[in-house]
C-alpha cells in the first residue's frame, strides 16, 4: 500500500472511530512498557537495557514528559535509541532537550533512522551533523561500529537500513565470536543480513503499523519485508529480534490498537 492509499484508508478508519466515540484517539499518549527477559551463558552478570525508538519529537509535551518519568523509574544500566529522533527541523531543539534529560547519569547509545537523514531536505541538519549534536547531548552514536558495554556484551550499531546506509559487514568485523552481540538498527529490514550472526537485534521504524484494525491488522508497514516484522518478539535463525512500536507517529497524529512503547530488556 502506498502513502496515498494509506491516508485514504486511515481517513475512513478515523471517521468510523469518531462516529463510535472510540477511545483510540487517546492512544498517542498512552505509553506501554513491554518487558523482555533473555538468558545467555555469554553474559557475565545481569544488565538492564531500555529501548526507545521513533521519537519523532515536535515538542516537549505530555507524552515526552511521561516517557522521561517512566525511564527514571525503570533505572536502566544502558539506554538505547533506535533512530528517527526528529522528522521536522522545528523538532531539533526540544528533541535535544529530551535526549539530554534522558541520558543524564546513564550510558546511552543510538543509531540514525531514515527521517534523521531526510530532515536535511527540509532545511534541517544532515545525518552526520545530527549524530554530532546527539553525541554532544549524551548519546554515543554507533554508525556502523561496535562498542563493548559490559564484560561479555557488545553493542553493534548500523546506519539506517531503510535507506540502505547500513554497513553490516564493517560493523560485524569489529566483534569477536564469544561476546553476546546486540545489534541496534533503525529498521528490521536488516534481519536477512544479520540473522544467525548476532544474538539480539533491537529495531523500530514500523511504529507497529500505527493503525491496526481488528482482523485486518496493521494497515500499512513501511518496510521492504512487509508485515513480517511489525512489532514485538521474533526469532530468525538463532537471532532474537525485537521491534519496538516507537513513541511518536508518522503521517497523522493518531494510533489505533497500537500504543506507543518503551521496551525493557533484562539480560541474565
Residue ranges, per PLM feature:
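Conserved beta-sheet core of the metallophosphoesterase superfamily
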Residues: 188-263
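N-terminal secretory signal peptides and thylakoid transit peptides that target proteins
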Residues: 1-14
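Beta-strand-turn-beta hairpins that frame and shape the catalytic cleft
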Residues: 40-50, 139, 147-155, 235-240
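Active-site neighborhood of phospho(di)ester-bond hydrolases with catalytic His/Asp-centered motifs
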Residues: 52-53, 79-83, 108-114, 142-143, ...
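Membrane-embedded segments
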Residues: 52-130, 137
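C-terminal segment of N-terminal export signals and the immediately downstream linker at the start
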Residues: 1, 18-50, 58, 62, ...
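Extended active-site neighborhood of metal-dependent phosphoesterases/phosphodiesterases
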Residues: 37, 97-160, 164-167, 173-175
Amino acid at each position: 500500500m502506498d502513502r496515498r492509499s494509506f491516508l485514504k484508508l486511515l481517513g475512513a478508519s478515523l471517521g468510523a472511530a469518531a462516529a463510535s466515540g472510540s477511545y483510540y484517539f487517546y492512544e498517542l499518549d498512552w505509553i506501554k512498557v513491554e518487558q523482555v527477559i533473555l538468558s545467555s551463558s555469554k553474559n557475565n552478570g545481569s544488565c538492564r537495557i531500555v529501548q526507545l525508538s521513533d521519537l519523532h519529537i515536535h515538542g516537549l509535551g505530555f507524552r515526552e514528559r511521561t516517557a522521561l518519568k517512566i525511564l527514571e523509574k525503570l533505572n536502566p544500566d544502558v539506554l538505547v535509541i533506535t533512530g528517527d529522533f526528529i522528522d521536522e527541523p522545528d523538532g531539533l531543539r526540544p528533541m535535544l532537550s529530551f535526549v539530554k534529560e534522558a541520558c543524564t547519569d546513564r550510558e546511552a547509545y543510538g543509531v540514525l533512522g531514515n527521517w534523521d537523514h531526510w530532515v536535511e531536505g527540509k532545511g534541517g541538519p544532515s545525518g552526520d551533523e545530527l549524530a554530532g549534536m546527539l553525541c554532544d547531548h549524551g548519546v554515543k552514536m554507533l554508525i556502523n561500529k561496535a562498542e563493548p558495554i559490559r564484560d561479555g556484551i557488545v553493542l553493534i550499531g548500523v546506519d539506517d537500513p531503510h535507506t540502505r546506509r547500513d554497513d553490516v559487514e564493517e560493523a560485524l568485523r569489529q566483534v569477536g565470536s564469544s561476546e553476546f552481540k546486540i545489534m541496534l538498527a533503525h529498521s528490521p529490514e536488516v534481519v536477512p543480513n544479520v540473522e544467525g550472526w548476532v544474538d539480539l537485534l533491537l529495531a523500530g521504524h514500523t511504529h507497529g503499523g500505527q493503525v491496526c484494525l481488528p482482523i485486518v491488522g496493521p494497515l500499512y508497514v513501511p518496510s521492504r519485508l512487509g508485515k513480517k516484522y511489525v512489532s514485538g518478539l521474533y526469532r530468525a535463525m538463532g537471532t532474537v529480534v525485537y521491534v519496538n512500536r516507537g513513541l511518536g507517529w508518522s503521517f497523522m497524529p493518531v494510533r489505533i490498537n497500537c500504543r506507543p512503547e518503551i521496551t525493557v530488556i533484562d539480560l541474565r
